């Protein structure tokens, strides 16, 4: 049965702000305390979703989460009414408030790791929500992420859902941002590449010195076991610790793959030749096409500032692919020159599409961060909750919803405004009704 890649983009939440919470993420640290525009952020994401839908790609939407997360503040000892909890946190621990108000769940590449049915032993699509244990503000996401995924992929015949791995650094899991699947066609059995930054239980193994490695080998292996992946369908590769120390906090900041194409920077991996040999040996029915970008063409610094590799690599047809990049790639002369040359070389990447995602980019999230890829057969796609699939009508509905509920400016001081909490809950309550998903959020389940 024919299968498709479906991209589920995160809808930016009403509290989108720049709290600078992500050490190791250069953009996040650079833009700390800037004033954000949640309305424009959401609309930028929606415009990308709609444009790709209009090009014929299958596109879905994943919901934002309840923020500020009052339940987490209560777990940290703040008491009283929701308003009192919010004001106590703002006064006593503003950094906590910034964390629980983060809209970071927009980057759905970190929501989960997904293995399609062609790869798994039970023939179902498997989802494991990422524990995101490396960052407090992201570690609180996975319970709601799991509920959202279960609500959208709600058919046990086709879909299997796993809880996040144990919330310890030894099993730090960042989801699909460190995972790429290679195959001939989406319905064919593929090879899943898991990329890790360190080996948790081997202190002598290579690891970065400046910035933390968020993903462990042990987490990758655990997810592969949960999904029932055969050893012949899995490759584990270590990300180069030196590029992590240059701000490459996820592999999708330095490499991207689709079907039988890997687009990567020459410094992306620790043992590149060994990894490519293993991938080529395990990939069935087609040849791996590795498109290497040398340091002389694009430096790691330029790759990080432009997010060249945090792009979407999409199939136009059986042979040709399109790269979806942020506008920052056109603003960087070296990257622009490289892309202009790339599409004329005769390789698999024939086209480049540029999108303005500046609101997300200032927090360190490009096109690839904003989407979770799910390969689905026709029958599986038919079993997906239909009201989250992009259409002309859904685009108009969500734009009107954003116009109704979102602010066009949020500063750090605004996060302590009890009215913002009310606005967020009102918006999300209406959203679950619009998308016909029932109760998903803590305030709805209380």
Curated annotation (Swiss-Prot):
Q: What is this enzyme's catalytic activity, as reactions? A: N(2)-succinyl-L-arginine + 2 H2O + 2 H(+) = N(2)-succinyl-L-ornithine + 2 NH4(+) + CO2
Q: Could you tell me which Gene3D superfamilies the record lists for this protein?
A: Succinylarginine dihydrolase
The family classification in the record reads: Belongs to the succinylarginine dihydrolase family.
Quaternary form? Answer: Homodimer.
Q: Which Pfam families match?
A: AstB
Looking up HAMAP family in the UniProt record yields:
AstB
Protein name in the entry: N-succinylarginine dihydrolase
Q: In which pathway does it act?
A: Amino-acid degradation; L-arginine degradation via AST pathway; L-glutamate and succinate from L-arginine: step 2/5
BP terms from Gene Ontology: arginine catabolic process to glutamate; arginine catabolic process to succinate
Signal peptide positions are: none
Give the binding site residues for substrate.
19-28, 110, 137-138, 214, 252, 363
EC number in record:
3.5.3.23
Show the InterPro entries listed in the entry: AstB_sf (IPR037031), SuccinylArg_d-Hdrlase_AstB (IPR007079)
Give an example GO molecular function: N-succinylarginine dihydrolase activity
Q: What does this protein do?
A: Catalyzes the hydrolysis of N(2)-succinylarginine into N(2)-succinylornithine, ammonia and CO(2).
Q: Does the keyword NAD apply?
A: no
Q: Which residues form the active site?
A: 174, 250, 369
Keyword terms, alphabetized: Arginine metabolism, Hydrolase
- Which of the seven top EC classes does this enzyme belong to? hydrolase
Query: What SUPFAM superfamilies does the entry give?
Result: Pentein (SSF55909)
């Amino acid at each position: 049965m024919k299968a498709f890649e479906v991209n589920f983009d995160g809808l930016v939440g009403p509290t989108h702000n720049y709290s600078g919470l992500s050490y190791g993420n250069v953009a996040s640290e650079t833009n700390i305390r800037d004033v954000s525009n949640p309305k424009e952020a959401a609309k930028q994401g929606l415009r990308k979703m709609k444009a790709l839908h209009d090009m014929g790609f299958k596109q879905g939407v994943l919901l934002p989460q309840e923020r500020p997360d009052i339940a987490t503040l209560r777990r940290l000892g703040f008491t009283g009414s929701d308003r009192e909890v919010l004001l106590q946190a703002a006064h006593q621990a503003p950094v906590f408030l910034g964390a629980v108000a983060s809209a970071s769940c927009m980057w759905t590449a970190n929501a989960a790791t997904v293995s399609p049915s062609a790869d798994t032993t039970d023939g179902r699509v498997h989802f494991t929500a990422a524990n995101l244990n490396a960052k407090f503000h992201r570690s609180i996401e996975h319970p709601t992420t799991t509920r959202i995924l279960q609500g959208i992929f709600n058919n046990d015949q086709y879909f299997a859902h796993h809880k996040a791995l144990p919330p310890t650094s030894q099993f730090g899991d960042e989801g699909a941002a460190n995972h790429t699947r290679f195959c001939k066609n989406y319905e064919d059995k593929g090879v899943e590449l898991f990329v890790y930054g360190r080996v948790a239980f081997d202190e002598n193994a290579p690891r970065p010195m400046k910035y933390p490695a968020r993903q462990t080998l042990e987490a990758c292996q655990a997810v592969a076991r949960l999904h029932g992946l055969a050893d012949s369908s899995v490759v584990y590769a270590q990300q180069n610790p030196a590029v992590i120390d240059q701000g490459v906090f996820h592999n999708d900041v330095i490499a991207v793959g689709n079907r039988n194409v890997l687009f990567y920077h020459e410094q992306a991996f620790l043992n590149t030749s060994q990894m490519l040999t293993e991938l080529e040996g395990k990939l069935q029915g087609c040849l791996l096409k590795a498109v290497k970008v040398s340091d002389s063409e694009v430096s790691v610094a330029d790759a990080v500032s432009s997010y060249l590799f945090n792009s979407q690599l999409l199939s136009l047809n059986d042979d040709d692919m399109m790269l979806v990049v942020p506008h920052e790639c056109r603003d960087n002369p070296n990257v622009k020159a490289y892309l202009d040359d790339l599409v004329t070389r005769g390789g698999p990447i024939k086209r480049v599409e540029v999108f303005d995602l500046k609101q997300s980019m200032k927090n360190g999230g490009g096109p690839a961060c904003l989407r979770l890829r799910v390969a689905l057969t026709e029958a599986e796609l038919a079993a997906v909750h239909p009201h989250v699939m992009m259409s002309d009508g859904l685009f108009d509905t969500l734009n009107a919803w954003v116009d109704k509920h979102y602010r066009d400016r949020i500063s750090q001081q605004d996060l302590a405004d009890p009215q913002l909490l009310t606005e967020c809950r009102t918006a999300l309550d209406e959203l679950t009704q619009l998308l016909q998903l029932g109760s998903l959020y803590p305030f709805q389940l209380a």
